[in-house]
Amino acid sequence: MQFRLTLLLLFALQSIVTAAGQPTWKAGSATTLITPEKPLWMAGYGGRTKPAEGIVHPLWIKVLALEDANGEKGIILSSDTLGIPKTIYDNTCAALKEKFGLERRQIMLHASHTHCGPVLRGALLDIYPLDEEQTARIEKYSTKLESNIVATVSKALENLEPAKVFSGQGISRFGVNRRNNMENEVPKLRAAGKLRGPVDHSVPVLIVRDMENKLKTLVFGYACHNTTLSFYNWCG
């Protein structure tokens, strides 16, 4: 059975530029590939019985750096991981402060919450039968992830340039309240217009264009628990 999910973005975009056309923002973005090179256990399902076996989509870190007219900087980071454990968050924020002078109020570290990413140091270690080799691999990967985050932020800051920043909000209706609707009943309930429970179908959007209006970066969010895929392949 093939499902088609139509994402309808109704952009009523508001430009955050001066009336005279002078840029009030600088923006820079960067990405880093973080797909594990060796098999690791996957985070997100307690019923898994073995490490990952292959790749569907690579895993990435993606960073947007913004600077306003007063020189105040902010970092938005997305990682293809289930979450960012406190140890990694703390170490990363400390490194970003030491290297770039960034305070925590200037840093947004976000995980896509994919259930097809690796187990990380400080999270879910007690629900998988990890041997010494796997534990060591997780530690090594987590340490490298920290350095990759810092390096990607560095690249994004180096790429800062005058930019136009737009904000807007769209809508996508594929999300369903899992607590109030049985999975096997969802197609029938949707067709009848009888899906139950609160949902948030809004899609907040941030668009960055250069001064020639070329699209540079797109940031969006959606409230949906990523539990659809349960195979043993990395998938960002």
Name each region found by the language model.
Residues 1-5:
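Positively charged n-region of N-terminal signal peptides that target proteins for export
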Residues 16-21:
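Sec/Tat signal peptide C-region and signal peptidase I cleavage site
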Residues 22-110, 114-236:
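Conserved beta-alpha junction segments in alpha/beta enzyme cores
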Residues 6-15:
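Bacterial N-terminal signal peptides
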